[in-house]
């Protein structure tokens, strides 16, 4: 009899614990970002904690979190790790300058488009200052080593447009590593979003645009948020927030503010490790 009572009490306790878990209200929106992509997402080294992460996408993420009644928590990590984290469900979503691609549509739920500015729809190639303006056609990259960030739209564009013309693709985990490779002669050029190229050039006077811009299919021109395939309810809420932001006409102001912030002395593109730890100096 005592054993039966103990079992019943244990079962009741278990049910109450399960019930409490079900009733627990979500308070945080976790968003994976790779803060090495100014002016979209980067770091203000004069600040610490969550406040150090700045840029257009951070402003957008804060807006979405506020619309959902949640507190934003940025989870910094490498660009390809952001995508893995969404697939594994270890974060709610990722906002990190993602363009639409067929592969992303297959592997994720994609939000409606958001527009960060004309400079983020153009895709360009940068090189050392001595070669500024010397290449305007794909054929001009024959024999060149052209870098791109892993799992990025730029990697795809190099594969489609420059490799057939005789270029060699070199993939880097981070933009920082790719820029260093360009400066040290390990690669001849680097494919970038035009706005990111402007930010890189403003901080590195030894780098310039080649003069070549990719011909980009319009479907690649706007940005999307990545969500797990099972997050249909969250996707609806995110899309509602994006629609409200678009109707309010706030995107241009956010982008201009981010560009200005990317030019301050404490602005830095920081490449985090896959596990979210800060790089060692």
Briefly describe each language-model feature range.
Residues 41-59, 115-119, 139, 268-280:
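Short, solvent-exposed loop/beta-turn-alpha elements that line the ligand-binding surface or hinge
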Residues 31, 35-38, 50-66, 122-175, ...:
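Bilobed "Venus flytrap"/periplasmic-binding protein-like clamshell domains
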Residues 71-140, 216:
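Acidic, polar ligand-binding/catalytic clefts
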Residues 25-98:
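Extracytoplasmic small-molecule ligand-binding "clamshell" domains
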Residues 1-28, 279-281:
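Short, low-complexity disordered leader/linker segments with a strong preference
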Residues 35, 116-129, 201-242, 261-281:
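Periplasmic-binding protein-like
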Residues 58-67, 130-132, 144-145, 150-153, ...:
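Extended ligand-binding regions for polar small-molecule ligands
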Residues 81, 87, 97-107, 157-161, ...:
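A ligand-binding cleft/hinge motif common to bilobed small-molecule-binding domains
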């Amino acid at each position: 009899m005592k054993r039966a009572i103990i079992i019943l009490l244990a079962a009741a306790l278990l049910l109450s614990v399960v019930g409490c878990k079900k009733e627990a209200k979500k308070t945080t929106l976790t968003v994976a970002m790779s803060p090495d992509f100014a002016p979209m997402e980067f770091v203000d080294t004069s600040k610490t904690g969550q406040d150090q992460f700045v840029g257009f996408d951070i402003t957008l993420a804060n807006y979405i979190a506020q619309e959902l009644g949640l507190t934003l928590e940025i989870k910094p990590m490498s660009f390809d790790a952001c995508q893995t984290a969404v697939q594994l469900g270890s974060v709610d979503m990722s906002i990190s300058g993602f363009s639409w691609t067929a592969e992303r549509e297959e592997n994720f739920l994609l939000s409606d488009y958001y527009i960060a500015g004309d400079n983020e729809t153009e895709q360009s190639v940068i090189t050392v200052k001595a070669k500024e303006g010397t290449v305007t056609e794909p054929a001009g990259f024959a024999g060149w080593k052209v870098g791109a960030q892993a799992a990025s739209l730029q990697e795809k564009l190099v594969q489609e447009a420059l490799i057939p013309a005789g270029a060699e693709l070199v993939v880097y985990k981070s933009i920082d590593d790719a820029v260093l490779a360009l400066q040290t002669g390990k690669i001849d050029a680097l494919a970038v979003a035009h706005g990111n190229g402007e930010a890189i050039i403003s901080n590195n006077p030894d780098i310039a645009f080649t003069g070549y811009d990719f011909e980009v299919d319009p479907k690649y021109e706007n940005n999307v948020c990545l969500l797990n395939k099972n997050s249909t309810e969250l996707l609806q809420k995110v899309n509602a927030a994006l629609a409200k932001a678009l109707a309010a006409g706030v995107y241009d102001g956010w982008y201009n503010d981010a560009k200005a912030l990317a030019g301050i002395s404490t602005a830095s593109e920081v490449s985090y490790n896959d596990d979210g730890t800060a790089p060692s100096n």
